[in-house]
């Protein structure tokens, strides 16, 4: 796992087309913005896990 430190307003670049920007920090919450092409799915982990569980149920 790569661990990086960013300040508010700073950006990470993933590949050629994805950027992740730190928008704000309040207490233990960090707001981030993600710019990615439409063909790249971006989900919070808990939403992604729910989607995967639903896909698994449909296969059963």
From Swiss-Prot:
Q: Does the keyword Nucleotide-binding apply?
A: no
Recorded GO cellular component terms are: cytosol
Principal subcellular localization? cytoplasm
Citing just one GO molecular function, the answer is: mRNA 5'-UTR binding
Compartments reported by the entry: Cytoplasm
In terms of InterPro entries, this protein maps to: CsrA, CsrA_sf
Please give the biological process terms from Gene Ontology that the record holds.
mRNA catabolic process; negative regulation of translational initiation; positive regulation of translational initiation; regulation of carbohydrate metabolic process
Going by the UniProt record, its keywords in alphabetical order are: Activator, Cytoplasm, Repressor, RNA-binding, Translation regulation
State whether it acts alone or in a complex, and with which partners, per the record.
Homodimer; the beta-strands of each monomer intercalate to form a hydrophobic core, while the alpha-helices form wings that extend away from the core.
Give the matching PANTHER family: CARBON STORAGE REGULATOR
Chain's role: A key translational regulator that binds mRNA to regulate translation initiation and/or mRNA stability. Mediates global changes in gene expression, shifting from rapid growth to stress survival by linking envelope stress, the stringent response and the catabolite repression systems. Usually binds in the 5'-UTR; binding at or near the Shine-Dalgarno sequence prevents ribosome-binding, repressing translation, binding elsewhere in the 5'-UTR can activate translation and/or stabilize the mRNA. Its function is antagonized by small RNA(s).
The record's comment on protein family reads: Belongs to the CsrA/RsmA family.
Q: What is this protein called?
A: Translational regulator CsrA
Q: Which gene encodes it?
A: csrA
């Amino acid at each position: 796992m790569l661990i990086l430190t960013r300040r508010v307003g700073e950006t990470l670049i993933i590949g050629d087309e994805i950027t992740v920007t730190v928008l704000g920090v309040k207490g233990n919450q960090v707001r981030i913005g993600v710019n990615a092409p439409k063909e790249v799915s971006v989900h919070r982990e808990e939403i992604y896990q729910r989607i995967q569980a639903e896909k698994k149920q449909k296969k059963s």
